[in-house]
Structure formats: structure tokens, C-alpha cells
UniProtKB/Swiss-Prot annotation:
Name this polypeptide is given: tRNA-specific 2-thiouridylase MnmA
Site (Interaction with tRNA): 128, 344
Reactions performed catalytically: S-sulfanyl-L-cysteinyl-[protein] + uridine(34) in tRNA + AH2 + ATP = 2-thiouridine(34) in tRNA + L-cysteinyl-[protein] + A + AMP + diphosphate + H(+)
Disulphide connectivity of cysteines: 103-200
Region (Interaction with tRNA) residue spans: 150-152, 312-313
Origin species: Streptococcus agalactiae serotype V (strain ATCC BAA-611 / 2603 V/R)
Binding of ATP, residues: 12-19, 38, 127
Amino acid sequence: MTDNSNIRVVVGMSGGVDSSVTALLLKEQGYDVIGVFMKNWDDTDEFGVCTATEDYKDVAAVADQIGIPYYSVNFEKEYWDRVFEYFLAEYRAGRTPNPDVMCNKEIKFKAFLDYAMTLGADYVATGHYAQVTRDENGIVHMLRGADNNKDQTYFLSQLSQEQLQKTLFPLGHLQKPEVRRIAEEAGLATAKKKDSTGICFIGEKNFKDFLGQYLPAQPGRMMTVDGRDMGEHAGLMYYTIGQRGGLGIGGQHGGDNKPWFVVGKDLSKNILYVGQGFYHDSLMSTSLTASEIHFTRDMPNEFKLECTAKFRYRQPDSKVTVYVKGNQARVVFDDLQRAITPGQAVVFYNEQECLGGGMIDQAYRDDKICQYI
């Protein structure tokens, strides 16, 4: 067996089962393991209990069980400046942001990585479901997690080669039920803890109420694309392209019973556009433009790429052709795509490898801009 005792791995521990098992596996493999809890948000639940305090207790319990030192580090300022301000700015611009992508890029694999280096880390590790492999030239390739349902490469697509060189994903080859089983067999304190869902800083709170604390809502008109007034919307920031619920209009308005969907936003006039039918014509597009294009390894400044892409998490891959120029790209779809959403990530794949991605700016239908923003 390889002697890993001189290799120090600092594990980002959230108090959940995935990061707990990550630390356990590395310890069993003989690494010099340190656990670190990141406090990124000052939060209390509906009972006034600080959720971070409870999570830190779980980290402490697991670290004691497996016999590793542990620390807590506060990244609230970094998180506010680099993730939350971005989140609010995107909503102000009428877009639908993906804070998880930015959190991984700026906090978990930047602020945390920098902190881990001060602890003498050779690597950092997290409980993400992704895999890394190193080729004969020392280049690290990021591959999808073996559990298709849990694969998180979509959220890791903005990581750089430098970040990946320093990263381990010990759960990448495992299925989620196996991770639970390992935790239960080891008797870990977090073995039966349920997974966290949703945006970390919102938690179980009502999204509309939460956003309204930071951005003033501006109600306006809700219209069909052919100009019929359908009533009032609560504020463009509360709606996302392709959304069905929360519109307050039934099928009767259209003379048929098809459900209504958000099909566009006009930020300058504060109009929310709606249409009937899941595959409403205004929701379908043939291409998109994206910025902040980034690849996990060095690529030319300008090139054409035929690959597959995801436009949202847990979506099946779609065949695309990508025309890259600097940090901008035009992505042309082989087949019509529904509800391409500005602000979300577009992520590129070559079979199992995640190549990188960018942030969606606009969707197009045959070179005509769609009803967005």
C-alpha cells in the first residue's frame, strides 16, 4: 500500500454525510487529514437556531470519531463580496443566477484553497461527486461522477487547471447509497442526516420573502407575446424563463386548458411575457451567446468545438457546436432547446470529461433574439 502519511489533505467539511465520508476515506487511505468547516453565511432557522453552529457541532463530532484535527474558518465577507453581490446584481439585471457555480469558483476552491495552503496542505478535498484524472503530461482532467444522478461537474465547470491540480474528489467513483452505507457502517454522527437542498443562504426560507429583503420589488404588467394584458406581475426578479407556477392565471384565458409559462422579460418596460404550452414557440431557441467562457485546461484563444452541453443541472446532454473567441462564445444547438435562461451556466462535455463552460447571456431563434430581457 502507498504511504500517504506525508501528504496533507485539508477537507472542506460542511457537517453533511458526503464531506464526512470524504474525510473518513482519506484517513483510511493513510493521508494526514485536517477538517475545516467554512462559515459562509450568518443564518438562523425559523426557531432562532444558528444552522452553522449545529453543522459545526456535527463536523466536530465526526472529526473526533475518525481522529482528525479540525478548524472553523469564517468566509462571510468573501462570500458576500464575491458570491452574494453577484447574485443580487444578476437578479437586478433580470437574469437567473447560479450562485453554486460562483461559490465553488470563488470560495470553496479559492478562499478555502488559499486558507488550506496556510495549514500546509498538499491538496484540498470536498464531498463533490466528480472525478479527476491526471494524464501523462501531468494535465488534470475533470470527469463526471460515477453516480449520474449526483454528478456535480456542472457546478464545478469554472474551476481552473491550477485549482484542479490541488483537488481530490474521493467520492467521485461512488454511488450515493454507498456513501450512506459507509457512514452508517462507521457509525458516523452524520450518517442519517438529510442532504441540504436549495441555495445555501436561503435554506428553507421562502425565496420571494428572502429576495425582497435585499431588492425592492417592482410590480408591472404581465402580457402575452401578441399584446394581451394578463394582469400584474409581482416583480421580474421573481420569475425565471420557462417557469410555470406562481403566475396566478389559469388556462381559461386562452380558450384552451394549456398551462401558462413565463416566456420572456422586458426589463426596460418592466413587462413579464407569458404564453401557453410547455413548448410555446417563444421558449424554443436554436443558439445562445455566453460570456465568462472558461476551460479547465489550456485552449486556443479562438477555435470551434463540437461537443455536448448542459444548460441546467441534471439535464441530459445535447449536441452543440461552440464557436469560442476569447471569453465569449456562440453555442449552436443540433436540436431546438427549451427555456434557455440568461444567467445560468452552459457547461461543455466530451463524453465523460467536463471541459468547462460559461454564463448564458442571450438565447436566439434563427439569429433573432428571443423574448428575454
